[in-house]
């Protein structure tokens, strides 16, 4: 997996740092500026991935919800953010170090097309961020989030195992 400092939601370029959401609603340390409004989820082979991993086990709270949000350009700064993807509430018991909260293809921008029933389109985002919604007060817990080209999530088998073809 190749990490790009310009596509990290957490930390600074050249380091693998983290966010530690504690209570309430908080946003990621970094907002990714795509420079021009675009649909980063379009295309395939390979599609860009949203990867969010727990680095330190969460303690003391009740749950965590993760959202990917996008905002259009508003004169060089973010306009109103809309949620592009939502994890739903994840119970504290599942917030363990090494687990992925998101390991998905980057979602496409939602467009309102005729005869689809969509009432409004999402403006093409120039800015992307993560939002954390926590219930309870977390005493510990750290998250790393980034957009990556490919995931490093191979299945590790124990030594000496034979897989028949």
Name every feature range the model reports, one short phrase each.
Residues 1-165:
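Surface-exposed, low-hydrophobicity beta-strand/loop segments enriched in small/polar/acidic residues
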């Amino acid at each position: 997996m190749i990490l790009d400092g310009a596509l990290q939601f957490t930390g600074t370029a050249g380091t693998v740092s983290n966010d530690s959401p504690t209570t309430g609603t908080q946003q990621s340390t970094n907002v990714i500026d795509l420079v021009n409004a675009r649909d980063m989820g379009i295309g395939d082979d390979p599609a860009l991935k949203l990867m969010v991993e727990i680095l330190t086990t969460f303690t003391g709270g009740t749950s965590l919800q993760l959202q990917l949000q996008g905002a259009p350009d508003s004169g060089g700064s973010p306009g109103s953010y809309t949620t592009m993807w939502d994890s739903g509430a994840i119970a504290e018991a599942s917030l363990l170090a090494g687990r992925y909260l998101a390991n998905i293809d980057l979602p496409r921008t939602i467009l309102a097309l005729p005869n689809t029933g969509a009432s409004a389109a999402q403006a093409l985002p120039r800015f992307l961020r993560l939002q954390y919604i926590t219930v309870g007060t977390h005493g510990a817990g750290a998250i790393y989030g980034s957009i990556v080209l490919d995931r490093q999530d191979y299945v590790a088998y124990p030594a000496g195992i034979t897989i028949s073809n």
